[in-house]
Amino acid sequence: ARTVSYSQLYGGKIAAALSRQHPRDLFDCKYMDTTLFCDVKDGFILCLLGSDKPIIESLHPNAIDQTEALENQFEGMSDIPFHYSDYEETRKNLIEQVNANMTNTDKEFLISFENGEPDWSKCCAGDLSNYPSVKWKLQNIDKLVKSNPKKHQEGVQKLQNFLKIQD
């Protein structure tokens, strides 16, 4: 049977939680041992690269108020209590844990990817260029570079500033 790897399964869950900030995803992450992030970082990077959002929006997301989603779409799904304060604490801890585990090499790779010229030798997960979601993201970056280079460069600069990496 073909199954998804542990790294992709849990790395994907973390990527989804940071991108969507939905209570279901963060509930799952609350009970994951995120101190072992290094065990799932490869899968996280793959899902981060294939996301439909800029990398910065996952590494440094604007907090979304999910009170209504918690009440209407999650409440009653678990016997384990999960209040909005748990949700906010989990989101904060997850963001901190992910960013604390990004090495300088990881950061340099993410900048090169967001520039549209990934240095795969710096990618902890190796060359992911053949994955359809990664190809799609790189095509979109290329389109942005051609159609609105200023917006593209501003996005790269924002990521560089957050990661504290200079040209």
Region spans (language model):
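Structured mid-to-C-terminal alpha-helical surface segments
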Residues: 1-167
